[in-house]
């Protein structure tokens, strides 16, 4: 298998935990957006003090309402743009991680275990060695075989997409 494919797979594996964290951050931002509601903005502008040009405080001019309505529209557009940006970053990242997880699940059980422990759960090679009662040298061989097989899977789908 080409070095390009194996390097790509190794990069995916090494960045797995960071990518999962980014996915969770983006999901949180989508579910709990920091937004100012149009009603809050209109209310704040509605009771704002004037510039002292003879209007009693608290009165609303047509100009103020026009500005508030424009702000409402601008706020809606900004919120929509933010949501679109979050989704456009989240979807490809989720697809990449889901694909990697699926391909890892297709490996032999021993390979899957080593990849999961090392890259998905972040254990050290010494911890994995103790847990699996396997030498680190053997673990590296298993990892290398798994990376080769993953690279073949990615190469196959790359050929199909052409």
Predicted regions and their residues:
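N-terminal interaction/assembly modules
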Residues: 1-103, 155-162
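Short amphipathic alpha helix immediately N-terminal
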Residues: 106-123
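Helix-turn-helix DNA-binding module
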Residues: 121-138
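Juxtamembrane/interface motifs at transmembrane-helix termini
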Residues: 134-137, 149, 160-161
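C-terminal flanking helix
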Residues: 147-154
